[in-house]
Amino acid sequence: MYRPNFYESTCLRCSETVYQVDRVGPLKDFTFFHSGCFKCVHCGTKLTLKTYFNNQHKQDDKEVYCSSHVPKSGPGHLDQTSVGIRQALNAPRTNKFVNEQIRGTRSEVDGGPLGGSRQSTPNGYGSREISSPSQNDSDYKYGRFDASALHIAHALKQTEIQKAYNKAREKPIDFYLAREEQAHLEMKHRKEEDDLYRKFASKRAEEDRKIQDEFQDEWERELQRLTHKFEKELATSRRSRDEANILTMRHEQQKEDLEKNMTLRRSKKKESITRKMLEHERYETAALVDRQSSEMLELISARRSEYMQSESIFLDDEFSEGAVPVEYPLNAPIPAPPAVSKFQIYTDPIEFEDVDRIAISVAQEDQKTFTDLVRQLVGRCTTDIEKARTIFRWITVKNLNAMHFDDDLRGDTPMGLLRGIKYGTESYHVLFKRLCSYAGLHCVVIKGYSKSAGYQPGVKFQDSRFRNSWNAVYVAGAWRFVQCNWGARHLVNAKEAPKQGRGKNDSLRYEYDDHYFLTDPREFIYEFYPLQEEWQLLKRPITLREFENLPFVRSLFFRYGLHFADEGYGAVVFTDDTGAATVRIAMPTDMQSCLIFHYNLKFYDSDEELSYDGVSLKRFVMQSVIGNIVAFRVHAPCSGAFLLDIFANAVTPQEYLTGEPMKFKSVCKFKICCEELQTVMVPLPDCASGEWGPTKATRLFGLIPITHQDPLIFAGRSLDLQFRMSRPLTDFMATLHKNGIEEKKLAKYVTHSTLDDIVTFIINFPEEGQYGLDIYTRELGGPQHHHHHNNNNSSSSSGEKHLLTHCCKYLINSSKRN
């Protein structure tokens, strides 16, 4: 029997009970509203806790108003409610911050520091050879982005996007299926679900009683044994009072230990049985949802067919010449590779701006039936793609993993729809399938393996550790993958934090990963391997061993349009006998100007070991960029296995130079195996983090190299480096590094001069060997400019200017023979 709890209140607007999951408040005088009733009393505008206002001039008025209709104090009055004017006037001035690559600072790579510098080996970097970029697949387009790449997305206009796939627009479900008929079938399904949950509850209670009775019997037997032993020891001979007390204390301690031991054993057994029962419950729930989804689809298909006998299902009366509108299939087609790629369906998520807005709006309220929920989501959708999209976005916006449920949740409360999520019997994937059936879409849940959290390249799939589930939905004439759970991950780059004048929720609330919506099979297979081969949706399916050996790439790899410049990369890369191995990644042309890469190298079997003989492992990797190729050349300092993690971020020069923190995300990982090492490896000079060579200087600072275009320079005992400035820069500084020599002792060997737009660096090497040269500069930003030799330089009081930022670095081999 249901008992009201303390958290129930009455809605001020409709006087009905407000449940905790649907509650807004307490507000003025401890008033509450339903989220759906929380509207302006005057105009009905939907309000939030940030946008509502109370009447400040009448204490008895408990109602809520929008900013336009809240009673004002009179004409000409300026207060805190006046369209944010005061907030704008009080807004703090923006400041310049130190860029994370400024000398001596650290930047974050997925939460870890980007400390020291690059990598190693004396002879390992003596080659001038850098291979040219390989050609892209001519029929494939790169460079898709989701909402996180706002500086790209906003530059595209929806009207300018042309697609190879055109879908005839269909009439909404309201045209051919009455809401009441669909709701009637839902109520039948809900009764079946209620019966199933009662069965689950009864079974759990029965198992709980069995465990309780079993341990109670054991407790009584053991207690009787201890008591008998205690009484026997007391009766065997005369005992002093102290001895009797000792025996009594020992007996009490034995009882306490027995109780603790049995409580622990009971908890473990209950946990084990509950886990097994939950697996069985998930199976039964999935089977029920599968059958109910089929029944719902049959109803929709039947009514749709009846309607089509007398009316056209399409909204458009005329079609382009030669185009035959494709009707949505009544029965689920067999799995087959899609003929049209995701890029041909849509090129940017901005195309779904309207349906995404619907999903976000619907997610702000709680519906009591799936019929109401799905009708609100797809009521204005005219294609199967839009229907699948709005369901996908609703789930990602809802963020079910973080949702709070009351313990006394009932099936007829708003959040009772999602009780399967609460109890763990229903997953994102089962829910997505259920909602798709209400929208008339064929959908399946696929089981298999995934390279998910905790997976590292080279790991074999031998047990259930990396088991996962995902969906395939039939849209755009083919089966296409959807991974709601991974798409709903709310991870935000630091550079995407709220800006001045924007609310926190504006930038964080609806973050999602568009890669996992309608993912192309040839990209999806890098992370997911189905148990049923046909659900790879590939023309040439691969084996589990081949899946294990695929490079370990993340969604960002595809969102940035990256691809490997050489054929044959596997999850494990083997070095040659000098300990050398190279990973080369190609960038699309339109991304070369904004992509920045970093990396991390550590021992494969240890998260803590980031150094070798006191030297950072990062100094055994040389990262360089030539053209559209970024290369990571590893020289293992010893035999063994290493983990190379490559990160990337897309930034503009303006973003880079402001000094705002940039958090890099992983794009791919490799296991580097060095089976034998015949050469002693020497670490690279301890320079600033980042790539070697002048490419970054040109890309971000407009500094064009005149004399040396490659990251590796062969020089005599002196060297002149020249650059041309394409925009004003000032306060150049160069630092020289060599293993075994303190940096400050090398400072006198580097000078520079500027003449018009030419800057020249002159280096006189004190001895032969390998050197690293760091170059720093800043944009012209104020009337005073001084040379600074540390990164704690602040702007002068008479003018604001950027702090010194790392510009580029070179690796120089100095020898009299050069």
Curated annotation (Swiss-Prot):
Subunit structure: Interacts with pnut.
Main location as per UniProt: cytoplasm
Any coiled-coil regions, as ranges: 216-272
Knockout-associated phenotype: Mutants are viable with a 98.4% hatch rate which is close to the wild-type hatch rate. No apparent defects in the central nervous system.
One GO CC annotation: cell cortex
GO MF annotations, alphabetized: metal ion binding
Record PROSITE patterns: LIM_DOMAIN_1, LIM_DOMAIN_2
Domain LIM zinc-binding: 9-76
Domain of life: Eukaryota
Pfam families (alphabetical): Ig-like_KY
Alphabetical list of PANTHER family matching this protein: HILLARIN
Biased segments, Polar residues type: 117-137
Protein name: Hillarin
Tissue distribution of the protein: Localizes to the neuropil of the embryonic central nervous system (at protein level). Also detected in third instar larval brain (at protein level).
